[in-house]
Amino acid sequence: MLDPNLLRNEPDAVAEKLARRGFKLDVDKLGALEERRKVLQVKTENLQAERNSRSKSIGQAKARGEDIESLRLEVNKLGEELDAAKAELDALQAEIRDIALTIPNLPADEVPVGKDENDNVEVSRWGTPREFDFEVRDHVTLGEMHSGLDFAAAVKLTGSRFVVMKGQIARMHRALSQFMLDLHTEQHGYSENYVPYLVNQDTLYGTGQLPKFAGDLFHTRPLEEEADTSNYALIPTAEVPLTNLVRGEIIDEDDLPIKMTAHTPCFRSEAGSYGRDTRGLIRMHQFDKVEMVQIVRPEDSMAALEEMTGHAEKVLQLLGLPYRKIILCTGDMGFGACKTYDLEVWIPAQNTYREISSCSNVWDFQARRMQARCRSKSDKKTRLVHTLNGSGLAVGRTLVAVMENYQQADGRIEVPEVLRPYMNGLEYIG
């Protein structure tokens, strides 16, 4: 959520920045609502003051032995008017808040202006895509060769965009997540967390999934007698529960940064992606991801973004997977991000780079929703923290990249050296 004072005092400047990311802010409507809010605020305060004054007069008149019935009726009438004014003010403030919850974050000044993914800017590349002297197989073919990917079984169990992994392919999938967690906790300074996969509405509002992206979530549908659980949803990313761990907290600045990681399944309806990536593991309703989250002082967030992106890059480098780093343009950034780097890994069968990590600085956008603050020992005043999140990495897509980049002419898959300790020294699948 944006700073309400910024919306009130600099609406045109806010509108101009939002226009860079293709969002039209209705300045006139917000201005009219704000003017009405001011009028109601003054009216409410005046009625409250008048009611307090009249109530005091009742006591004074009673002490003098005077008739207080007319004063009592007047105070009652003022009370009714005050209640009505408060109700109108509350409704108006709720309307303003509802609008504010649909407004995306402002882009950082250095973010390239653009409409969509075609306007993203490549920053760097690492590694050289391998030249194969045989016909490249995609991960689906390789998975079926080794009886490791069973999409038909998943359709029987659930439906499309799910998979059953088996044998050494399933083991490599597990090895990848363990390798990522060990790297982030042992070398990058993150603490490992195990979090709920179901979260409530407040949690989803805190990180910005609600109200705008309710259609992207899988919501629980409880029995009537269990209606208290009706507001749960499956997490679309571990960013949601991890970031909300600081919701409503005031953190000692000496304890910052807080760096957290978690390996979880992620659940997404993939609304709007019908017909895209229908083959294989690239776009699933359920997929695993190792997530990184940082809670930092405001002045440290841009440096933290560079650090976090480097942590995701390190995973790819140790796995020996060629990738490129891009900065997303204003029109392609996520709702809450002010600046985002994507890492795209080389997928040989598609002869292109595909997203495998997205690392974002969210500034105080989520912190304002969550009321997550920090305070230094020398200053009693609190301020909002900055939050960052990043994939470190998407496990399924990393599995795809390893299978395809490490395939052999005979269909075997070489196990990257860094994964072998997690696979009992296995050098090849097949």
From Swiss-Prot:
First-tier enzyme category under EC: ligase
Cell location: Cytoplasm
Binding site for ATP: 268-270, 355-358
Molecular function, one GO term: serine-tRNA ligase activity
EC numbers for this chain: 6.1.1.11
Chemical reaction(s) catalysed: tRNA(Ser) + L-serine + ATP = L-seryl-tRNA(Ser) + AMP + diphosphate + H(+); tRNA(Sec) + L-serine + ATP = L-seryl-tRNA(Sec) + AMP + diphosphate + H(+)
Keyword presence, Transport: no
GO CC terms, sorted: cytoplasm
Gene3D superfamilies per UniProt: Bira Bifunctional Protein, Domain 2, Serine-tRNA synthetase, tRNA binding domain
SUPFAM superfamilies named among the record's database cross-references: Class II aaRS and biotin synthetases (SSF55681), tRNA-binding arm (SSF46589)
Main function: Catalyzes the attachment of serine to tRNA(Ser). Is also able to aminoacylate tRNA(Sec) with serine, to form the misacylated tRNA L-seryl-tRNA(Sec), which will be further converted into selenocysteinyl-tRNA(Sec).
Full protein name: Serine--tRNA ligase
Protein source organism: Shigella boydii serotype 18 (strain CDC 3083-94 / BS512)
Origin organism lineage: Bacteria, Pseudomonadati, Pseudomonadota, Gammaproteobacteria, Enterobacterales
